[in-house]
Amino acid sequence: DYGAYVFTNADDIDTSSNNALRSRWYLAEEESIYIGYKYYETRYFDSVLDQGNASQALTGETKDGGKVWDYDNEVSYSFGYGVEGSTFSEEITDAKIDWSGETQSEVTVKVTNTGENAAKHAVQLYVSLPYTDYDKETGLEKSAIQLVGYGKTGEAKENSFEDVVLLEPGESEDVTITFTATDIYSYDVNEKHDNVTGAYILEAGDYYFATGNGAHDAVQSVLKEQYPDKMKDAEPTGTVYKEAVDSKRTLTESNGSTIQNQLTDGDLNSYNCGTEVTYLSRNDWAHTFPVGIGEITATEEM
């Protein structure tokens, strides 16, 4: 929902002649976290599992205005999709995950050139988080797949952009992707600690790391690992590594500062402004999908 939305009482509250300083406009980002691939791939994930009314669509919600949401009608090429000069296979051969985030985590992927041409290959690493009953009850939103990091073959041997190292047919190379595990945590506005509310949390459950030619390939790999009966016709090219987290973890401090809710007054629902904003939720895709922002009256509190 982007555009120039004007408060119903804009003329009464805005006396500035400078457009940069005027306070007559507002915007409600009803899409929540579901922007770009995080929307399309998460809704696809839920449609495969027939949850959250993911396959049900309201008028105007699909490209053709239909009543059924279908990924193939929405996306031509997924985020991260690319065409390379050869074909490659991938295999996750090693993973060292430090869930505390105190040290860097590493995932090593063995890449083999299975084609006939020498070429480079980009390795994309994604992760799928558990979407729990707690998340559904409290409105903690999570995308079904998210990019963790990426790497390329030949990088370890290259000294400059001109010094390109290609992987020859039949050859293999290990590509190691590093990341900080706390970047995978989700922000929970309800988490209480140290007499404040709001923190990053990592819930107990199974975490699936996946590679693939783009986000859709990765999410299909995760689905096929978890629900093979539902993915009989899918042929993803990625590889999957699963690691279980036994208990919940929280991140309550960063760089010496306490983590807590600080921007809750940015939510228009915090004010009695004439309408209620509904934010998109994977708990009910069809009935929370943005259909336009209602008229809003600026209050003295704003």
List each model region and its residues.
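Intrinsically disordered, low-complexity Pro/Gly/Ser/Thr-rich segments with frequent PxxP/GP/PP motifs
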Residues: 133-196
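Secreted, periplasmic, or luminal enzymes acting at the cell surface/secretory milieu
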Residues: 1-106, 110-120, 126-128, 134-138, ...
